[in-house]
Amino acid sequence: MITQKLITKNRPYKKLKELRGIVIHWTANVRKGANSQAHYLYFNAANRSSSAHYFVDDKSTLQLIPDDEVAWHVGDAIKLASLPIRSKYVPKGDNPNNYFIGIEMCMNEDADQKRVLDNTVQLVTELMLKHKL
């Protein structure tokens, strides 16, 4: 089940140009308690210069940014310019964040990590069906 808890900081309030796919990351925060709620609090505080649409842990999935808005999760166009997949999905000189939904998996040490993966698969399936990807 997805719970919507939209952030007001670290959110550009800019519409995606076109939804072309989903990018899955992990938070790289393995500390105890680094679940989706902890990341919601982190990204809704000071300016972090990054964000994602969804945070998934072993118990919940939080949506922080609407699917049709930009989140800062992929990096910028210059850093990713040499990736072959980039030229297929992102126009030259544009930013990949304008085209992808970002999902962050919370793989903290006290999480059931198999459950995190299962919840992520469920979310991706729902999003692919919803957006006909």
Residue spans for each PLM region:
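Active-site-adjacent loop/helix surface patches within enzyme catalytic domains
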Residues: 1-133
